[in-house]
């Protein structure tokens, strides 16, 4: 008992395990017989794991009901999902195992409710699916198709970007009798409007294989340019991806190193008013890099200068003139520098002319103020006019002490003239202290000698 699935990627032959899962095999065979699976999309593709199909419209469509069993089609919505028992001996241990997608039955935990959706494994030993899906068949032919499905480009929900669909189903052998009311269609039906609404890139759509090499190269360059522009926008080099270079700016190269901004502006000013003209120079040395940017007020003047000045001899050098879009990186850096210079000339802060930086953030003013710092002395300073003795000590602390001692205020000098240079301490001076200590010891010594004589006199008595 086998079924042939004709898909958009090739044919797949499935052998049905009728003895182990008779009810699931009957459901699958009869759905194939009524052409229920025609135009069903592949979805839930998980690389090296599995893919799912069997919903004729697809789970992304609001018109989808998730599929139906053959008995639901014949008897009504009450039989849309039928309970099936899990075959105990069958496991998802081989690539190409086919099983019915199922959910647990609310009435019996040993049963699973299935409709029309089925799963095909893309890897070996997928025990995660054991006990969750009802196995009913094995793929015996078409493993190359399984590999193509495994390598397909998919979105974040697992649906292939280019549709993979079941085109036809062919029953090779059917051992089951048809249920009452089943009528086999004479030919494969056309896709419904709901099915056609789910098409992304049709499985038979040509993606440019008939284009010539030149057209393919042009298309590739356009895509690469858009990708690069988007990258520059993300990193902040461009304000937006579709930005266009200015059309009133000329790029002039092959200049003589001695050519100055004023010379170039004078030569090009005969074509119209020039807003800015700058020879680009090395930031470190200031030497000319031998190219410049000239910004005209009008695009017409810029175009006229472009046609007239190409190959003109300036300072013994034949210059090359082009529009700035041919060297967009150089033009961008020059434009940023020009905007900064203009902003500095206009004044203001943050693009608003009325704003002004706080004083602590004005680097130039701070530097100017620090350069004008000076020592300030009191006009009534009565420092000693006598020459200071030269100190033979090299200690900076001693010099600082002498400076502090010599630089007395007038108030302190008047105090010293009134009371003298006497110390504020109540203790006697050092030399007086030594004399007092010596007299004290002498008195004790005399008193001791006197006491000893008295003691000897008592002994004699």
UniProtKB/Swiss-Prot annotation:
Which reaction equation describes what this protein catalyses? Answer: [protein]-peptidylproline (omega=180) = [protein]-peptidylproline (omega=0)
Q: Which Gene3D superfamilies match?
A: 3.30.70.330, Cyclophilin-like
The chain positions of domain RRM read 248-326
Q: Where in the cell is it found?
A: Nucleus
Tell me the segments the record calls region Disordered: 372-461
Q: Which UniProt keyword terms apply here?
A: Isomerase, Nucleus, RNA-binding, Rotamase
Residue span(s) of domain PPIase cyclophilin-type? 1-171
Record field: compositional bias (Basic and acidic residues): 378-392, 400-461
For this UniProt entry, the molecular function terms from Gene Ontology, in alphabetical order, are: peptidyl-prolyl cis-trans isomerase activity; RNA binding
Looking up PANTHER family in the UniProt record yields: PEPTIDYL-PROLYL CIS-TRANS ISOMERASE-LIKE 4
Role according to the record = PPIases accelerate the folding of proteins. It catalyzes the cis-trans isomerization of proline imidic peptide bonds in oligopeptides.
Instruction: List the protein's name.
Output: Peptidyl-prolyl cis-trans isomerase-like 4
Species of origin? Emericella nidulans (strain FGSC A4 / ATCC 38163 / CBS 112.46 / NRRL 194 / M139) (Aspergillus nidulans)
């Amino acid at each position: 008992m086998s079924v042939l699935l004709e898909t958009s990627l090739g044919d797949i032959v499935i052998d049905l395990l009728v003895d182990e899962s008779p009810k699931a095999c009957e459901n699958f065979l009869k759905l194939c017989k009524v052409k229920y699976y025609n135009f069903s999309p592949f979805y839930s593709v998980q690389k090296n794991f599995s893919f799912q199909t069997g919903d004729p419209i697809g789970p992304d469509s609001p018109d989808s009901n998730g599929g139906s069993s053959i008995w639901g089609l014949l008897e009504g919505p009450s039989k849309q999902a039928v309970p099936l028992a899990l075959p105990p001996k069958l496991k998802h241990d081989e690539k190409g195992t086919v099983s019915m997608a199922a959910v647990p039955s609310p009435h019996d935990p040993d049963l699973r409710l299935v409709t029309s959706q089925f799963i095909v494994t893309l890897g070996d030993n997928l025990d995660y699916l054991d006990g969750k899906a009802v196995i009913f068949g094995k793929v015996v032919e078409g493993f190359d198709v399984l590999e193509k499905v495994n390598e397909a480009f998919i979105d974040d929900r697992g649906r292939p970007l280019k549709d993979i669909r079941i085109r036809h189903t062919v029953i090779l052998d059917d051992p089951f009798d048809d249920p009452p009311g089943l009528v086999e269609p004479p030919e494969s039906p056309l896709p419904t409007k709901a099915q056609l609404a789910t098409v992304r890139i049709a499985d038979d759509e040509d993606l440019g294989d008939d284009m010539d090499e030149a057209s393919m190269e042009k298309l590739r360059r356009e895509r690469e340019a858009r990708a690069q522009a988007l990258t520059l926008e993300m990193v902040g080099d461009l304000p937006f991806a579709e930005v266009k270079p200015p059309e009133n700016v000329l790029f002039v190269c092959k200049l003589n190193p001695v050519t100055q901004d004023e010379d170039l502006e004078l030569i090009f000013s005969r074509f119209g008013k020039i807003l800015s003209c700058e020879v680009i120079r090395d930031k470190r040395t200031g030497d000319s890099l031998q190219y410049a940017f000239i910004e005209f007020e009008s695009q017409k003047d810029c175009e006229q200068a472009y046609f007239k000045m190409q190959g003109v001899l300036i300072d013994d050098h034949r210059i090359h003139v082009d529009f700035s879009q041919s060297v967009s990186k150089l033009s961008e850096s020059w434009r940023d520098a020009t905007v900064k210079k203009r902003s500095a000339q206009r004044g203001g802060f943050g693009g608003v002319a009325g704003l002004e930086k706080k004083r602590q953030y004005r680097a130039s003013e701070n530097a100017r103020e620090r350069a004008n710092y000076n020592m300030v002395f009191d006009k009534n300073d009565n420092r000693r006019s006598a020459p200071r003795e030269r100190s033979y000590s090299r200690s900076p602390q001693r010099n600082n002490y002498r400076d502090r001692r010599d630089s007395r205020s007038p108030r302190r000098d008047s105090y010293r003239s009134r009371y003298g240079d006497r110390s504020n301490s109540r203790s006697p001076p050092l030399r007086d202290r030594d004399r007092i200590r010596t007299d004290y010891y002498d008195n004790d010594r005399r008193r001791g000698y006197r006491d000893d004589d008295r003691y000897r006199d008592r002994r004699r008595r």
